[in-house]
Amino acid sequence: VICPPFYCDHGHGIRLGEHVFVNANCTFLDGGYITIGAHTLIGPNVQIYTPHHPVDYITRREPKEYAYPVTIGEDCWIGGGAILCPGVKIGHRCIIGAGSVVTKDIPDNSVAVGNPAKVIRKVD
């Protein structure tokens, strides 16, 4: 289920597993693939970014965009307002706290919160 409004760049780069729920007002920039595992819940206002731009300002002037895939495992819960940055992998059975900014991979069975998101505990 995807609740409107929903925003994406292309749509063809988004892969959803069975029984995925995407709440309202989410933005998925899918220049690279976005893969969301089965039974995952995405809260409202979540943003998933695959595009990455060079840090060097001269290179950034070139009309190029690089994209790195974002992967979310099965049975995850991504809290409202979370931001997932290019190239991150979130393992299976993870919880990402509301408003968190995920800049690095999160291992299976983790609860991660904050900006940048850090693992604060494991879940069974």
Give, region by region, the residue ranges found by the protein language model.
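Flexible, glycine/small-residue-enriched loop-and-beta-strand segment within the central core
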Residues: 3-89, 115-117, 121-124
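A generic "structured core" feature
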Residues: 35, 73, 77, 93-101, ...
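Extended beta-solenoid/beta-helix repeat architectures
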Residues: 89-91, 106
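Acidic, glycine-centered active-site loop in nucleotide-sugar glycosyltransferases
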Residues: 107-108, 113-116
